Amino acid sequence: MKKIVLYGGQFNPIHTAHMIVASEVFHELQPDEFYFLPSFMSPLKKHNNFIDVQHRLTMIQMIIDELGFGDICDDEIKRGGQSYTYDTIKAFKEQHKDSELYFVIGTDQYNQLEKWYQIEYLKEMVTFVVVNRDKNSQNVENAMIAIQIPRVDISSTMIRQRVSEGKSIQVLVPKSVENYIKGEGLYEH
């Protein structure tokens, strides 16, 4: 049975902390396949500074190239509108019947899982991998996996704000992503 990891997020933009999460999960679980799953629009997040989806996909591919593993699953992008993880996983599972699916979330998402659409069915379809960036270890439900990673206080919101203020984002994102953001004039308004 294939082991497949799905790492969802807006990735607007993808950054160094996302790379650390991907790397830690990849090396801990050693999956056969690893997918970055960019959302079109998350139902639980505000949508400020939204850029053309192609920019996000390009930056994710740059991260994949740098990490040396992973692919992009753009199912939610193709669907458009609000993305519910349940719908995405259900469709993905139909395409990958003989696979064990692992879905990466942070402790912030873990703490609001009860708000997720069809969460009980979703728990039957995937094993949640809860990534904790805090000093204290996270207690998770028995059917879930907790992975502790180094705390890195970087957020996409911070990066967008720094760019709009003309501040440096060096090392917050890989050089290729930094150059792309500058070259395309992203987040400057």
UniProtKB/Swiss-Prot annotation:
Pathway where it operates: Cofactor biosynthesis; NAD(+) biosynthesis; deamido-NAD(+) from nicotinate D-ribonucleotide: step 1/1
Listed Pfam families: CTP_transf_like (PF01467)
Source domain of life: Bacteria
One GO term of the biological process aspect: NAD biosynthetic process
Catalytic activity: nicotinate beta-D-ribonucleotide + ATP + H(+) = deamido-NAD(+) + diphosphate
Keyword Nucleotide-binding on entry: yes
SUPFAM superfamilies given in the database record: Nucleotidylyl transferase
InterPro entries found in the cross-reference section: Cyt_trans-like, NadD/NMNAT, Rossmann-like_a/b/a_fold
EC number: 2.7.7.18
One MF annotation (Gene Ontology) recorded for this entry: ATP binding
Enzyme class per UniProt: transferase
Alphabetized UniProt keyword annotations: ATP-binding, NAD, Nucleotide-binding, Nucleotidyltransferase, Pyridine nucleotide biosynthesis, Transferase
Function: Catalyzes the reversible adenylation of nicotinate mononucleotide (NaMN) to nicotinic acid adenine dinucleotide (NaAD).
PANTHER family assigned to the protein according to its UniProt record, in alphabetical order: NICOTINATE-NUCLEOTIDE ADENYLYLTRANSFERASE-RELATED, PHOSPHOPANTETHEINE ADENYLYLTRANSFERASE
UniProt similarity note: Belongs to the NadD family.
Protein name per the record: Probable nicotinate-nucleotide adenylyltransferase
Organism: Staphylococcus aureus (strain JH9)
Gene, per the UniProt record: nadD
